[in-house]
Each structure stands twice: as C-alpha cells, then as structure tokens.
C-alpha cells in the first residue's frame, strides 16, 4: 500500500479497467489487535494455535483506497482510467528500454497485473466470532500518516 500512496500522491497512478476490484489488506496495528484478541479470547481453548485470514471486512476496492488516500492527504486528485491493453503496451515499451540500463520506473508489468486481479479475502474466523475492528480504512491511513508522515509526502 505504501507504493500505492506514493503513486497516488505523485499522480502516477491510473485505474486499470475496473475501479471496483477488491484488494484485501489490513493495517498492521489492526493485525496486532486481532492477534491479541484471538489469543485473549481463546475461543478454541482445546487448540494449540488458531490460523485465520486477516483483512478488512469488506476488503476495500482500489477506488476506495485511492479516495481514502486523497482524503487523508487533503488533496483532490483526478485519477484517469485506461484500458489494460494500453497500460501493458506502455509498460512493456518502458521495460524494453529501461531494462538494459537497469533503470527503475513506476510502470511495472507485475504491479499492473496485481491491480487487475481481485484478492478479496473474507476474514471468516473473525466474522464468526464477532471481532470488532478498531480502524476503518480512513482511520488507518490517518494513524499511519501521523506515525510516518514522510511516507505521505
């Protein structure tokens, strides 16, 4: 997500087709709270460990991430949307010329593919056991910005 923040704030981010692609994610502090909650409640006392999926519920869409970043940064950005074929063509072209010179660039083919695929994870264990989230997406970003302001420049 830190790369997404940088891309949005530097106006290097583009939607690839569907704005509503779900991207599972969770704030690190929320993950720590959830682990502590699972250990404290010991809902499965007979088990030595509990394995669970962790994500916000529901997983935010890529558009919700971008809007939350803009909100927390107090900036209103227009984020263009391009068909994936155009972005892939650009990315492959940039990669072709940049790779021999070992130049880093923000148009990674792998990252574009990641934006297209939904990785919507349902935190079933937490839902079934009524876990109460401490942070919304915007609250998580605000807290992150407060703790790490350099990542929001």
Predicted segment positions?
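Amphipathic terminal alpha-helices
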Residues: 121-128, 132-153
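Short aromatic-enriched loop/helix-cap "lid" or pocket-rim segments at secondary-structure transitions
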Residues: 1-3, 64-67, 91-94
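Glycine/small-residue-rich pyrophosphate-binding loop that anchors the diphosphate of NDP-sugar donors
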Residues: 22, 117-118
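Short, surface-exposed alpha-helical segments at coil->helix boundaries
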Residues: 2, 63, 120-124
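Short aromatic/basic micro-patch
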Residues: 25, 59, 120-121, 134
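Alpha-helical substrate-binding/gating segment
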Residues: 5-14, 23-75
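Terminal hydrophobic/aromatic helix or amphipathic segment near a protein terminus
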Residues: 70-116
């Amino acid at each position: 997500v830190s790369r997404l923040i940088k891309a949005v704030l530097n106006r290097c981010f583009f939607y690839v087709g569907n704005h509503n692609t779900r991207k599972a994610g969770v704030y690190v502090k929320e993950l720590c709270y959830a682990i502590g909650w699972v250990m404290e409640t010991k809902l499965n006392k007979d088990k030595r460990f509990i394995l669970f999926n962790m994500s916000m519920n529901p997983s935010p869409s890529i558009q919700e991430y971008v809007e939350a970043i803009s909100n927390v940064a107090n900036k209103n950005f227009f984020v263009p949307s391009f068909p994936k074929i155009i972005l892939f063509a650009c990315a492959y072209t940039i990669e072709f010329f940049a790779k021999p010179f070992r130049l880093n660039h923000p148009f990674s083919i792998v990252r574009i593919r990641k934006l297209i695929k939904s990785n919507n994870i349902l935190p079933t264990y937490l839902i079934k056991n009524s876990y109460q989230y401490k942070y919304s997406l915007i609250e998580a970003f605000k807290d992150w910005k407060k703790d790490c302001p350099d990542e929001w420049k």
